[in-house]
């Protein structure tokens, strides 16, 4: 009986469940759709980074299509570790200086020798190769190399008022970008080393921040920290180039610039030669006016020579370069003539980004930023990963620097990345992140 009762209960339950179906057959589906649509989509990236900054404030070059046609392949075949010079030295000592016919004759003789002679000859050749490897290197130098006792060197400092064209001249003479060049003042914030090597002579350029003098003869307090190193290093250079914008001087003379030129030209330094460079002569329409400016400063005894140049277009720079080459003294080179040091490349990466920043962001924002190189890593495929942070003290400045939807920092990053790839001739993965202090 109990079995029959339980069977009846099960039948009644099954009948009630079939009658309680929802009126709307899509009701359950709508419920599930509303439920899942309220959940976060975990496959899509979040708009907030781990440090709390918006994703719009980060530029990543890997997310932008960049033309690689002008960049050589970074993957190079592995070179043999054996020095071919040893083989050449052995051939000279073992076979002598053979002509083509002599080489053929030796080859024929070797082929006709018996096995024992071949074994002996191989042993002698192996011994000669080992001796050549153990010998001290001979005095023969590769192409472009100069003996240390024949090397000449010169350290050149370039100073002047802000926006005088010091960075442009440094970049033109060195042949690549080592300092930020912009129309804004106080573009250079630290000394940047550029190296020019020609023949047996190496010239090292030090580009310094713009210097100005008050009536008292001392630097202004608002840029005191920026120019402190420039003033302390003035007397350390072999040659000092004092530069000013001659076009601006003719249009609206600045008494502070005149004081700086006279201050540097009044007292002679027996251990240092000083030259006065009138830059941006290409902007002066009446060339006779240049002679008037030269006469204005001709009585300053510390200046050995006067040069009229255009650091941007290169006019007159050849004469200045030749003068500097002639002033070089016998001294070993301080920098590698064939490769840039990693420190120089790091400075170049900072200066390239800084120049683009000055071109796209106006007012006082670029000068209040803290610009840091956070990561510098060479990847396995030969490319270079560079990460820089731009730290601003104000939220309003951060919004201006980022732009709507990250458009401004994106434009800065794209232009800087393309120029870095061109300068370094390799693939560069540039990451720029704008942060709030």
Swiss-Prot record:
Region span, G4: 279-282
Region annotated G5, chain positions: 309-311
Low complexity compositional bias, start-end: 51-62
Keywords tagged on the record: GTP-binding, Nucleotide-binding, Phosphoprotein, RNA-binding
Record-linked InterPro entries: G_ERA_dom, GTP-bd, GTPase_Era-like, KH_dom-like_a/b, KH_dom_type_2, KH_sf_prok-type, P-loop_NTPase, Small_GTP-bd
A GO cellular-component term linked to this record: mitochondrion
Gene3D superfamilies according to UniProt: 3.30.300.20, P-loop containing nucleotide triphosphate hydrolases
SUPFAM superfamilies per record: P-loop containing nucleoside triphosphate hydrolases, Prokaryotic type KH domain (KH-domain type II)
UniProt biased composition (Polar residues): 39-50
Region described as G3: spans on this chain: 207-210
Residues modified as Phosphoserine: 111-112
Stretch list, region Disordered: 39-65
Chain residue ranges for the region called G1: 160-167
Taxonomic superkingdom: Eukaryota
A Pfam family assignment: MMR_HSR1
Function noted in UniProt: Has a crucial role in plant growth and development, possibly by influencing mitochondrial division.
Family that this chain belongs to: Belongs to the TRAFAC class TrmE-Era-EngA-EngB-Septin-like GTPase superfamily. Era GTPase family.
Protein name in UniProt: GTP-binding protein ERG
């Amino acid at each position: 009986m109990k079995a029959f009762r339980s069977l009846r209960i099960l039948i009644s339950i099954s009948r009630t469940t079939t009658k309680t179906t929802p009126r709307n057959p899509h009701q359950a589906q709508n419920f599930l759709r509303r439920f899942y649509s309220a959940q976060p989509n975990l496959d899509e990236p979040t708009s907030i980074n781990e440090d709390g900054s918006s994703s719009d404030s980060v530029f990543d070059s890997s997310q932008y299509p960049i033309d690689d046609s002008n960049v050589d392949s970074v993957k190079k075949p592995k070179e043999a570790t054996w020095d071919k010079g040893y083989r050449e030295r052995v051939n000279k000592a073992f076979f002598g200086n053979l002509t083509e016919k002599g080489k053929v004759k030796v080859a024929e003789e070797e082929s006709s020798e018996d096995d024992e002679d071949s074994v002996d000859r191989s042993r002698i050749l192996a011994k000669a190769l080992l001796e050549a490897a153990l010998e001290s290197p001979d005095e023969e130098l590769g192409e472009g190399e100069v003996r240390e006792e024949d090397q000449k060197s010169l350290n050149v400092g370039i100073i002047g008022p802000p926006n005088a064209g010091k960075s442009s001249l440094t970049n033109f003479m060195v042949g690549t970008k080592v300092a930020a060049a912009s129309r804004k003042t106080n573009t250079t914030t630290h000394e940047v080393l550029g190296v020019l090597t020609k023949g047996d002579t190496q010239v090292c350029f030090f580009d310094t921040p713009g210097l100005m003098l008050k009536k008292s003869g001392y630097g202004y307090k608002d840029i005191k920290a920026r120019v402190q190193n420039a003033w302390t290093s003035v007397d350390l250079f072999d040659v000092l180039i004092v530069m000013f914008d001659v076009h601006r001087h003719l249009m609206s003379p600045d008494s502070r610039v005149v004081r700086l030129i006279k201050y540097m030209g009044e007292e002679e330094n027996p251990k240092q030669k000083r030259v006065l460079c009138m830059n941006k002569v290409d902007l002066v329409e009446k060339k006779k006016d240049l002679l008037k400016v030269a006469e204005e400063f001709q009585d300053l005894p510390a200046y050995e020579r006067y040069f009229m140049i255009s650091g941007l277009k290169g006019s007159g720079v050849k004469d200045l370069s030749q003068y500097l080459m002639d002033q070089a003294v016998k001294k070993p080179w301080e920098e590698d003539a064939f490769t840039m040091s990693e420190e120089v490349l790091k400075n170049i990466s900072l200066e390239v980004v800084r120049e683009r920043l000055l071109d796209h962001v106006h007012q006082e924002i670029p000068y209040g930023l803290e610009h840091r190189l956070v990561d510098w890593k060479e990847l396995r495929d030969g490319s270079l990963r560079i990460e820089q942070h731009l730290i601003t003290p104000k939220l309003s400045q951060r919004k201006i620097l980022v732009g709507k939807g990250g458009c401004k920092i994106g434009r800065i990053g794209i232009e800087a990345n393309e120029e870095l790839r061109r300068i370094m001739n390799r693939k560069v993965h540039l990451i720029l992140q704008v942060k709030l202090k």
